[in-house]
């Protein structure tokens, strides 16, 4: 995919597995992320995600260590043209 590079800012749509059980209503919200690795040429990437969790009222949830987290890492994330939970997309450009 053209434009894929480490350091690019993209959008990540929060998946319900990123959230605590009582916060599933936040699935699909879009947050900022940075590409930290390009996994393949077909647009699969690893991301560091940056939720505005203190203002949005939710915390990301790590299944391995069940505690609130700030930034979080997502591996092997697929691209979506439009925001879709668990996938990344390019930020829209203003015209």
Residue spans of the language-model regions?
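Short, charged beta-turn/beta-strand-edge "cap" motif at the junction between a beta-strand
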Residues: 1-2, 13-20
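Short, charged/polar surface micro-motifs in flexible loops or helix N-caps
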Residues: 17, 41-42
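Short beta-strand-centered aromatic/proline hotspots
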Residues: 21-39
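Intrinsically disordered, low-complexity, charged/polar segments
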Residues: 42-95
